């Protein structure tokens, strides 16, 4: 049985604050995120995303393509409440799919957050104008999480990303100039991927040089355009349909006539090694570690986790 879809909630201010639930049920010090300061708090200021990325689960199955937002006053009220309830918080993360989808709103929100004196981060698309970047930075923005996905323009077209490589380069350069950190995310194995485009993406990542990166494998979630596309084109078969293994390690479910599952899977480790094992990047990480005992402890923990991750992937491959 499939019931009719419920009407989408339009008045987002009707939603209760989530932070009192955190206060009641969570010890936030137990939750770590490699690119955010610790401890941090994360919540939403809106639902939905205007982008039509073929692989993305959230707008296609949950939030929709209209960005429905809480009022700025409602968001600021919750942040102010959370400041008092969690004085130990070092950073707030706004987990909207793309907080920068509405430039006038994010600028106005930033100016109100600036009055509270908080440090914050958010998801962003790599097309934010420099003028907006300045406003956000001057009002507490420290970091963007940016989905670059690939360094190949044709693949960006294939996945309907709505982004051009030159815009991403300019945005990243502006962020570097303004002192805004970037955690860049990339996806290998998207439609149109080849050995050559993987190499192109690795070179692109090292060229633009975000502060940190995350490299994922294309995941054809049921309900997405990518899933339907994969079935129609024979890129997904029953013997390799799982997205993760029993230990949570991500698998490479897609394959192409010119690119096998294992070639896509193995390229993730190659990507990480070539990005992080560069002299300049190593020097940057060491410099961060020497900046404070907290950063030393954090980077050492992350290093252990990183090598554990690589070992798990290598064991899975064999």
What are these regions (language model features)?
Residues 47, 218-220:
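AMP-binding (ANL) adenylation modules
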Residues 17-183, 190, 195, 200-203:
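Radical SAM [4Fe-4S] cluster-binding motif and immediate context
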Residues 5, 15, 55, 106-107, ...:
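Short aromatic-enriched loop/helix-cap "lid" or pocket-rim segments at secondary-structure transitions
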Residues 1-26, 51, 272, 290, ...:
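Flexible, acidic/Gly-rich N-terminal and inter-domain linker regions that tether
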